[in-house]
Structure formats: structure tokens, C-alpha cells
């Protein structure tokens, strides 16, 4: 018997909505990464993108444990000499809360072309409104 490898037409991608309010960042990110990879499906194959679309709401209301609000730092570089900028998690949640969840999930996905394809299926919003109601997303509870 040959090993089954899913084709593009065999993969049924669904849309899910996650409310991130009062959820711990790392635990939420692992669940989202598993959905994006498709690890919860029977047809999971490491070299094929079998994952679903995930819409995350209330990204600004996530929780973290310990002192991470003040101690966890995010770095970016402006590509100019001396242009290394750093922000704490507290500042990031005030300015760009979407980036916090995207960064956490991106770190849990493969670091190759497939990972870039998977992260495009993640949609993160700070409020409760999102433009993906036409896809009729299912509510996902963790």
C-alpha cells in the first residue's frame, strides 16, 4: 500500500475565529500554530500545507504570566548604523497588538517557504470587528 499524500484539491480549508481575551500568549500561539499547520487533521503531511485559516480577535487583551509585560523585549533594526530599536511587551500591546501574536505564532511555524505560506492564513485584529464574515468562520474554543 502506498503512502497517501494529499493533493491541493483534497485539502478542505476552513475558517476559524478565536477570541484572545484573557488568554495566555504562548498557549494561544501554540494552538493557532497547530491549526495553521494542519496538525489536527488526519491528512497532515509535513511537506504539504494542510492548515486552516485563523482569525484572532481582541489581540490587545491577551495575558502573559510572570513579569513579561516589563521584561519581554521586541527588537527591530532600521538598517542604519546604530538603528537597533527595542520595545517592551507593554509598549507593543499599546502600539501594535497584532504584531505580538503574529511574532509568537511565526516563531512556532517552519522557517521555510511553507512557513511563509502558513503565516499568510493568520489574520489578527485588535478589536472585535473583522472583515471575514463572508467566509462564515467557526468559533474555536481552547
Curated annotation (Swiss-Prot):
Asked if the Swiss-Prot or TrEMBL record annotates the protein with the keyword Ribosomal protein, the reply is: yes
Query: What SUPFAM superfamilies does the annotation carry?
Result: Ribosomal protein L13
Membrane-traversing stretches = none
**MF term (GO), any:** mRNA binding
Q: Name one GO biological process term.
A: translation
- InterPro entries, from UniProt? Ribosomal_uL13, Ribosomal_uL13_bac-type, Ribosomal_uL13_CS, Ribosomal_uL13_sf
Q: Which UniProt keywords apply?
A: Ribonucleoprotein, Ribosomal protein
Report the PROSITE patterns cross-referenced here: RIBOSOMAL_L13
- Which Pfam families has this protein been placed in? Ribosomal_L13 (PF00572)
Gene Ontology, cellular component aspect:
cytosolic large ribosomal subunit
Subunit: Part of the 50S ribosomal subunit.
In UniProt terms, what function does this protein have? This protein is one of the early assembly proteins of the 50S ribosomal subunit, although it is not seen to bind rRNA by itself. It is important during the early stages of 50S assembly.
Question: What family classification does the UniProt entry report for this protein?
Answer: Belongs to the universal ribosomal protein uL13 family.
> What is the protein's given name?
Large ribosomal subunit protein uL13
Gene field: rplM
